[in-house]
Regions:
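Anion-binding and metal-coordination hotspots
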Residues: 1-192
């Protein structure tokens, strides 16, 4: 990516995480050099190990919104809740106390249908959880673990570095969840 300040080029990467809502553990991670998040939902979802199962729903911010992503989630039987734009911080009292919206017609665009879905009570509740699931994890990685930039270069090396960052977050989180009382590691005398 062209850097306008020094006329050189910078390497930028797009790191993603899938976070379990109950434990706040990172269950899947991916990294790419794509400039936006629209193409990142599918690789991040595929990074979740099959042994953990498939989530029943997913809440994503508006950077992930596309008709293709909605169809991909539906094909996997995952109920998507993807923002369609920015919500105002302070809606007017008319909007706050407005009567319930009427469902959009069947031929409405995916964006109109998703906007309606997010205005339902269940849509609001599920999307609200995103703010206290994924965002704290990213904040802890940036602030507590002090990880703000990659030390390595090249996509494969940086992907490995991101995997280590996610692993270190999960170890820290497991320590918190178990109050530092992890079961002892048992090593058999034969080494197997």
């Amino acid at each position: 990516m062209k850097n306008s300040t020094n006329q050189g080029f910078d390497q930028h990467y797009n790191a993603q995480v899938a976070v379990d809502q109950d434990s706040l553990l990172i269950v899947g991670q991916s990294l790419s050099n794509h400039p936006n998040d629209q193409a990142e939902a599918q690789p991040t979802l595929e990074a979740i190990p099959p042994a953990l199962g498939t989530p029943s729903s997913a809440a994503l911010d508006n950077g992930y919104f596309s008709a293709a992503n909605i169809e991909h989630f539906k094909a996997l039987r995952i109920d998507p809740y993807i923002a369609t734009g920015r919500d105002p911080h302070h809606p007017s009292w008319h909007e706050r106390f407005a009567q319930s919206l009427t469902p959009p017609p069947e031929q409405a665009s995916p964006k109109v249908k998703m906007a309606y879905k997010l205005q339902t009570e269940i849509g609001k509740a599920i999307y609200r959880l995103r703010k206290c699931t994924v965002e704290p994890v990213i904040g802890i990685i940036k602030e507590t673990l002090a990880f703000r930039q990659f030390s390595l270069r090249g996509l494969s090396h940086v992907a490995g570095e991101w995997a280590l960052v996610c692993l270190s977050f999960n170890l820290k989180r497991l320590h918190t969840l178990t109050n530092g009382q992890l079961p002892p590691l048992r090593i058999s005398p034969t080494g197997c």
